[in-house]
Amino acid sequence: MLKGSLYKDIVRFMLEKSGYYVSPYGYDSSLSELKFKFTEETRNSKTGRRIRFSPDLLVYDDQNVMLVEVKMRGKSPPMIRASEIKNVKEFWNDSVLVVVVPEGNVFYAQRISELEIQESDYYQLSDFEKFQDIFTRVQAEDISYYKGIALQNMKIK
């Protein structure tokens, strides 16, 4: 299993346990066969780029439907490149970015539409909210449980 995929699964399990319906979505799951078929020309077309930057998960409950991109950063402070946000913002401005990091709450999230385009190279963790502030069904004990799993897999205790 790829490292990034593990953290997508951790986020998925936590959301499902909290009562959200979660389905894999996008380039790394339902469209993964396209990775090997794109030419450079199709990969860099507007539609090709939209597909490549598609979010990882479709998350919904009886009140919300969200597209969610999950990123893991194993170093502290986490480096979230502005160019990554710019690409997601261009095509998926209504999505949510979840960042899994080896510090604090471990799980953070922000609506892409609320992240301002900036001149600096990186976004700071302070630009994000605690995961449970965006995904309000998630309970503190679930954050604690999945935080332990995430940190163990990051080899940080």
Outline where the language-model segments fall.
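Catalytic cores of nucleic-acid endonucleases
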Residues: 9, 18, 23, 50-52, ...
